[in-house]
Amino acid sequence: MDFAWVKTAFRTKRRRGRKPIGVGRWASLAARLVNPLALGSLAVGLSACALFDFGPPGPDDYPVKGIDVSYYQDDINWRSVVADNTAFAWLKATEGGDWSDPKFAQNWHGAAMAGLPRGAYHFWYFCRPAMEQVSWFLQNVPYDPYALPPVLDIEWVDSKTCPGHPPREAIIPEVKTWLEAIERYYGKRPIIYTSISFYNDRLRGAFPGYFVWIASYKGHPVVRDPSLRWNFWQHTEAGRVAGIRGRVDRNVFNGSTREWQAFLEGRLNPDG
């Protein structure tokens, strides 16, 4: 369950024409909300809390932050990236069955030398058989027991060489083949990266037990779809991080630092 909103719940806010509420008054209010003797019951306190609508948590409210990169970011100073509160990075490795990122090997080595947990991701091509895409990923991404789980990036793109949107019944078996083959080789269950619309249209319910990484630039994933289960959130493609010239995708992990450590050790249940 996500409690990242708690840290923002009692921030001092200046309202137009009014002085900000002091810390003492917030403390008094908090005591009244949680003290059963003052309000009669905890239920009453929770009802009172509901009167304050602070909105969903923002990216800054999640303690574990990371990036994903490709050759578009050019040369990266990975030590500066780590120093800028970056806990993880996924690096584009392959696309389809015949394209590899020209910066992948450099990024793979550089991130590891900087002590940053990093993994590789594959961009799905709908007009290539799953096993060809598996083979291509294996050729380009070395086995490393300390790497983050591989990621499958699957989403709709405008492609002149592969037009059309295959139906769910055509996509699910192919994706399942890729995920299972990659897990057998690397020993870690892959993560599924996608958009909310693609997840709902083509993937929802088909892959229980997999971590889900959602791209949502227009707002918090749960605000856009309250029923959505997500583990990573790509909240912008225009982020700034020390060590990288220009823009970069930024992400957060849906959990505490303790849960992140459990994820790194393979002990975290993706379904909660």
List each language-model region with its residue ranges.
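Residue-level detector of anion-binding/catalytic polar loops
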Residues: 87, 117, 189
